[in-house]
Amino acid sequence: MLFKGLVLAISTFLCLIQAKEKQSNILIDELYQDKLWVLEKSTDDSLKIYSKKINGINLMAFRVNKTVTIDPLEIINVVSDLENYANFISNSKNLKTEKLDQNDGSLRAYQHIKISLPLFSDRDYFFKMIANKEALYNDKLIEWSLIDLERINEMDMSKKDENAIYLDYGAGMWLSRPVGEDKFDISYRLIMDPGG
């Protein structure tokens, strides 16, 4: 009887993990689709901001596009270089990023965001990033998704701030589409529950 109970508990746990992974894949697929994005703002320098309601989710997705002359591989190099975020993220003093491991074009990392406002708690999360053009398809450069706490091992869990609100629902991606000679439409797409 104890064995059957243990098997049932493990099976339930594995089903929950698979459901979270499936949910993450659905988010990535929805962000990738170009349908149903609503243009919210456009500027003269080609910046465009969009929003999108995703069915079954009580959150908005956001997308920013800009035409640039930056080599898309350079975007992969910069965004996946977690150790140097302080060199290109303007508010990096409020962001702590630590790479946990990396293999085959994907990495796992921990981020802590310090919120310097009264009555607001810091936020933190673990995430997985795939930054390998060969591992992704079509025009994707990078995709990332948040990792559920249940999937974090004990050693990595020691990095988590117990007082921060954990964010476990979110995903994003960088896309690049050629729009002319040495010009690319770069798109960053994001959906995340800010918690609290």
Residue ranges and their predicted role:
Residues 20-196:
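Eukaryotic helix-grip
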Residues 10-19:
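Hydrophobic h-region of N-terminal signal peptides that target proteins for export
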Residues 1-9:
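Sec-dependent signal peptide recognition
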